[in-house]
Amino acid sequence: MKAYLTLLKPRVIWLLILASAAGYVYAAGGVDWGKLSSLLLAALLATGGSAAFNHYWERDIDAAMRRTSRRPLPMGLIKPGRALAFSLALSAAGVALGFLLLGPLPGAFVALGWFFYAVVYTMWLKRRSWLNVLAGGFAGNAVFLGGYALGKGHIDLAAVLMSFAVYLWIPAHIWSLAYKYKEDYRRAGVPMLPVVIGEQKAVVVISVLNVASVAYIALLTLLFLPSLLSLLLVAVGAGAAVASSIYALVKRTEGAMWKMYKSSAPVLTIFLVAVMLA
């Protein structure tokens, strides 16, 4: 059972599920626990299914990388065929429940989130281009927009702008992690940004992108979450992230980049919590 739970990548998908909940609560202006429960269930199944499919599709990559070599498929804990069946069953259930329980528009965003991660990122671009993360990041937009559509019944400019807080955070976060494990990715033949453009250029790009994503989140907070509590929460997280980014840009060492990764990781969570409290 533990091996199958690992396939869901709980440390990854919980943030996407939180994004869907934040979109719903903000748009609805309150909580209908029946709707929220249905949203969380559909999001859990769809994101978990896409994560499990990623485990199946990338089992050869995982086996070649030290960081991922102890995952269930490389370790032989789950047969590939069973992992595939498990992933497709979860995915189908999540998308179906999205349409049946949430409605056409939220359901479409649930399906789009699955598609961008499982197909665009995992199947199409992961092994082909460093743009993989930029394209796959639209899964983050989709989960937020799905929740927002459920809460308000439609999508507006505020929804789109706020969804890009998730999108912009994703590449800075993933590329910071990829910087630490760049030799793993190079050995596995995966064209992540630090592998493609080199270490020094990668430090500049990732640090600047991290500052830009944090600045964007701060701007959204000023525009849409003008409460003192929201401003204080985001200010604390943003300050730490910007300071660590500047430190990484100056030092340009693996240790400094790892500090930036750790410091910036909570920023999106803080923002999404602030969205729910608005």
From Swiss-Prot:
It is a multi-pass membrane protein. Carbon 2 of the heme B porphyrin ring is defined according to the Fischer nomenclature. CDD domains: PT_UbiA_Cox10. It comes from Pyrobaculum calidifontis (strain DSM 21063 / JCM 11548 / VA1). The gene is ctaB1. Converts heme B (protoheme IX) to heme O by substitution of the vinyl group on carbon 2 of heme B porphyrin ring with a hydroxyethyl farnesyl side group. This is Protoheme IX farnesyltransferase 1. One of its GO terms (molecular function) is protoheme IX farnesyltransferase activity. GO terms for biological process: heme O biosynthetic process. The keyword Transferase applies. The chain crosses the membrane at residues 12-32, 33-53, 78-100, 105-124, 130-150, 157-177, 202-224, 228-250, 257-277. Belongs to the UbiA prenyltransferase family. Protoheme IX farnesyltransferase subfamily.
